[in-house]
Regions:
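Extracellular carbohydrate-recognition regions
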Residues: 21-59, 229-245
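Carbohydrate-binding surfaces in secreted/extracellular proteins
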Residues: 163-189, 218
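Beta-strand-rich interaction surfaces with strong enrichment in secreted/lumenal proteins
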Residues: 84-90, 150-156, 204-205
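Extracellular beta-strand elements of beta-rich domains used
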Residues: 100, 218-220
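Secretory/extracellular carbohydrate-interaction modules
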Residues: 79-139
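Short, aromatic/His-centered strand-loop micro-motif at the edge of beta-sheets
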Residues: 141-163
Length: 245
């Protein structure tokens, strides 16, 4: 049976990092999103109890160790990138949602780089990059997560779990962190691609940069009927939300 998720009544807007003060990811109430989806069946769990299972380590060169215990993926610190890629059954390329909890346990850079399929390409959500604060999609029209309209600066606490949700539709990508809509990106007519060695994480992968992290409650759920936006997509505008120190 289809499950119905109601996500609010208005769109969320991303903002350029240079126009947005650093703030805590959970300082503000959730921004309503104004769309509904019907899920095509239950969510699929992507982590086993004690082994990598359908995941395999990425040979980045100089990477740390990755392992699974108690349904939690631990990604160790490497010289640069460390991560795993999906080596299991075929994945959807649109109309699906990835969800997980992630935390940084050591290091100062991104603790959740999630590579995922988008139509005929792939994209990567960066959480906590560029010295620990940048959130964004890499790449949009060849611009990475630090320099496109999805770029935001948020503060993240070490050893704190953050709920991360990525919804991929044929025409847009939506990202929530702790139920706060942080990215609403129109991808029609845009070039979606990956930056550098994250291409080794396809078709789906999880990675960190010089950072130790843990991922748990990782699921994938297909979407049966994505709702259309209640109004035409509007370009991102600078955030007017106050920062909280």
């Amino acid at each position: 049976m289809f499950g119905l998720l109601v996500a609010g009544q208005a769109f969320c807007h991303s903002a350029f990092a240079q126009e947005t003060e650093i703030r805590a990811a959970t300082d503000l109430p959730p921004i309503p999103v104004g769309m509904q989806v019907e899920f095509a069946g239950p969510a699929r769990t992507l982590l086993t109890e004690s082994e990598l299972g359908d995941w395999d380590t990425v040979d980045f060169g100089g990477g740390g160790e990755s392992s699974v215990a108690s349904h939690t993926l631990e990604i160790g610190i490497g010289e640069d990138l460390t991560g795993v890629f999906w080596d299991g059954a075929d994945l959807p390329v649109k109309d699906y949602e990835l969800r997980m909890e992630a935390r940084r346990t050591e290091g100062i850079d991104f603790f959740c780089g999630t590579v995922f399929p988008v139509n005929d390409s792939h994209c990567c959500l960066i959480v906590g990059g560029w010295a620990g604060a940048t959130v964004g999609l890499s790449n949009i029209d060849d611009k990475d997560a630090s320099s496109n309209e999805t770029t935001k600066l948020l503060t993240f606490q070490d050893n704190r779990w953050y709920d991360i949700r990525i919804r991929v539709l044929s025409d847009r990508i939506i990202v929530w962190i702790d139920n706060q809509c942080e990215i609403y990106q129109n991808i029609v007519g845009r070039k979606i691609s990956l930056r550098g060695d994250t291409e080794l994480c396809t078709p789906m992968g999880l990675c960190t940069f010089q950072t130790k992290a843990e991922i748990r409650k990782l699921t994938l759920q297909r979407i049966g009927k994505p709702a259309k936006p209640s109004k035409p997509f509007e370009p991102p505008i600078p955030s007017s939300y106050p920062s909280k120190q």
